[in-house]
Regions:
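Surface-exposed loop and turn segments in beta-propeller and other repeat-based domains
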Residues: 86-101, 158-172
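A short, structured loop/turn motif at beta-sheet edges
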Residues: 109-119, 144-149
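Acidic/hydrophobic-patterned starts of short beta strands in beta-sheet-rich repeat architectures
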Residues: 53-62, 115-125
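Surface-exposed turn/loop modules enriched in turn-prone residues
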Residues: 66-94
Length: 190
């Protein structure tokens, strides 16, 4: 009996270790500043260390200054090359009214769907009509695959019922698009 329990524990541990495609680390991401990593925005909203099988990475979301004429949201990935981190991905959204774009960190997905050792992700952004207290006009899902951005979104125009896709979305491999669209379709949207 003891042997069976030990075997199950060992098997479960090995299975979980092999299933782990990335390790999310906080390291210095909580106190990350522009002097640590040159992110594009004036203020950091969110940062997390994500180490996949091939590289150490930091995923940073930042925005332009509060009170600016428009709203700019940046999603960037910094990957370790040698002894330093370099920007390996950047995605930028703009809106004519400040504080109208909101990154939703608790609905993101990080995975290595194609098992190439590099993580893919889905980030969710709520786009409000005129600031954070106004109604949501669009929900955007930005898929990062091989350091390129692909978008899926729903709009208030049709009561958030139909998915729309960026022009390059069809270039995503089917397993990647299926994985993230399945996740996307399970999310509650306004």
């Amino acid at each position: 009996m003891k042997r069976n329990v030990l075997f199950l524990i060992l098997f479960g541990t090995v299975y979980l270790l092999n299933a782990q495609v990335s390790m999310i680390t906080s390291q210095f991401s909580q106190n990350l500043t522009k002097s640590d990593l040159p992110f594009s925005g004036d203020r950091k909203l969110y940062a997390i260390g994500i180490d996949d099988k091939n590289t150490e990475n930091y995923f940073v979301v930042s925005k332009n200054r509060s009170g600016a004429d428009n709203d700019e949201l940046f999603i960037e990935k910094f990957s370790k090359e040698g002894k330093q981190f370099v920007k390996s991905f950047q995605y930028k959204l703009t809106h004519p009214i400040n504080k109208s774009l909101a990154f939703v960190d608790n609905r993101a997905s990080y995975s290595d769907v194609d098992k190439d050792g590099n993580y893919e992700s889905l980030s969710i952004i709520d786009q409000h009509t005129s600031g954070p207290e106004s109604k949501i006009e669009k929900v955007i899902g930005m898929i990062m695959y091989q350091n390129k951005a692909y978008e899926v979104w729903v709009s208030a125009d049709d009561n958030f019922s139909q998915n729309f896709y960026s022009d390059n979305f069809s270039q995503l491999p089917t397993p990647i698009s299926k994985h993230f669209i399945d996740f996307w379709n399970r999310l509650n949207k306004p």
